[in-house]
Amino acid sequence: MVNDVLREAESRMKKATEALRNHLATIRTGRASPALVEHLHVEAYGATLPLNQLATITVPEPRMLVIQPFDANTVKAISKAIMNSELGITPTDDGRLIRLAIPQLTEARRKELTKLVRARVEESKVALRNIRREALEDLRDLEHEKMISEDEHRRAQEKLQELTDRYVRELDHIGATKEAEVMEI
């Protein structure tokens, strides 16, 4: 029972950490990365599809993304989706390939992105604390129902705190890495 509560908490913490990683991957740095655009939604074939289902995205140079649609008829729709996104990048297309030149970030934009990274990390920490609180409530319920002893409850609380601390350190590391990436010129 205690192990089930701890396993569930760890699983949810892992998901929160992955969600942060995925979200931070979409934040633009001075470097080109397919993660910047792969989840953009494109109106094609009468539906809205993620870009990575319509094209291959490559990085031929550190500041260049090349998008090669599987179907040349989707080039205009993909360009439109990129223009409508908040990336601030203008696509150039030759009818079959789309090139995205990633401009250098200004100092003000870097600081703005750093604040955004910190805010996302803090939101994830709040999510971890909420997961911990819910797990603590579950453990308390088990103790009140006499399914576990007070000692087992205390040991489980300590394990849960260690788990939370480990994931908070991981979130801090992910955030620091992304901040360094954003501030890199």
UniProtKB/Swiss-Prot annotation:
Kindly list the biological process annotations in GO that this record carries: translational termination
On whether Cytoplasm is a keyword of this UniProt record, the answer is yes
Q: Where in the cell is it found?
A: Cytoplasm
- The gene coding this protein: frr
> What is this protein for, i.e. what is its function?
Responsible for the release of ribosomes from messenger RNA at the termination of protein biosynthesis. May increase the efficiency of translation by recycling ribosomes from one round of translation to another.
**InterPro entries (alphabetical):** Ribosome_recyc_fac, Ribosome_recyc_fac_dom, RRF_sf
Q: What is this protein called?
A: Ribosome-recycling factor
Lineage, top-rank taxon, reads: Bacteria
Q: PANTHER family under this entry? A: MITOCHONDRIAL RIBOSOME RECYCLING FACTOR PSEUDO 1, RIBOSOME RECYCLING FACTOR
